[in-house]
Amino acid sequence: MALHVVLFQPEIPANTGNIARTCAATNTALHLIRPLGFSTDDKMLRRAGLDYWEFVNIHYYDSLDHFFQQNQNGDFYYITKFGKRYYTSYDFSDPSKEIFFIFGRETTGLPKELLAENEDRCLRIPMTENVRALNLSNTAAILVYEALRQQSFHGLS
């Protein structure tokens, strides 16, 4: 497993369900950091993921610290509108690397101290100034498919 999507305290079940479907389609692991803003039995979550849940490699953590303790050998990238560099300026081309794309809450993003400690790994997707943020599930798909594009869609048909 080379690609990972990490959701820090996601709040909207449909976003997480859509991301789970993208993860199933791309053999990308999904990591959820509690607390979640919904039950994993939520109808909207299940509906968005359709019948692909059995194909999702999903992991749960009680905190960011717990997540980092369990995943020490990865390349971590923090997705934020405050990143100084575009996502396209990073090299994700090595399919043997464990690449983690870390996303924050839909309403508040990632903790500011985490971003400050990892400024060189904060990346963003360009957009006009009149839009506050892209949808979380769309953003995750953009990052996953950019990494896969750089890897010549390794393992996909």
Swiss-Prot record:
SUPFAM superfamilies: alpha/beta knot. Belongs to the class IV-like SAM-binding methyltransferase superfamily. RNA methyltransferase TrmH family. TrmL subfamily. The lineage of its organism: Bacteria, Bacillati, Bacillota, Bacilli, Bacillales. This is Putative tRNA (cytidine(34)-2'-O)-methyltransferase. HAMAP family: tRNA_methyltr_TrmL. Its EC number is 2.1.1.207. It comes from Geobacillus stearothermophilus (Bacillus stearothermophilus). It is found in: Cytoplasm. GO terms for molecular function: RNA binding; tRNA (5-carboxymethylaminomethyluridine(34)-2'-O)-methyltransferase activity; tRNA (cytidine(34)-2'-O)-methyltransferase activity. InterPro entries: Alpha/beta_knot_MTases (IPR029028), SpoU_MeTrfase (IPR001537), TrmL (IPR016914), tRNA_m1G_MTases_N (IPR029026). S-adenosyl-L-methionine binds at I79, G104, I125. Keywords: Cytoplasm, Methyltransferase, S-adenosyl-L-methionine, Transferase, tRNA processing. Could methylate the ribose at the nucleotide 34 wobble position in tRNA. It catalyses: cytidine(34) in tRNA + S-adenosyl-L-methionine = 2'-O-methylcytidine(34) in tRNA + S-adenosyl-L-homocysteine + H(+); 5-carboxymethylaminomethyluridine(34) in tRNA(Leu) + S-adenosyl-L-methionine = 5-carboxymethylaminomethyl-2'-O-methyluridine(34) in tRNA(Leu) + S-adenosyl-L-homocysteine + H(+). Pfam families: SpoU_methylase (PF00588). Gene3D superfamilies: 3.40.1280.10. It comes from the Bacteria. One of its GO terms (cellular component) is cytoplasm. GO terms for biological process: wobble position ribose methylation.
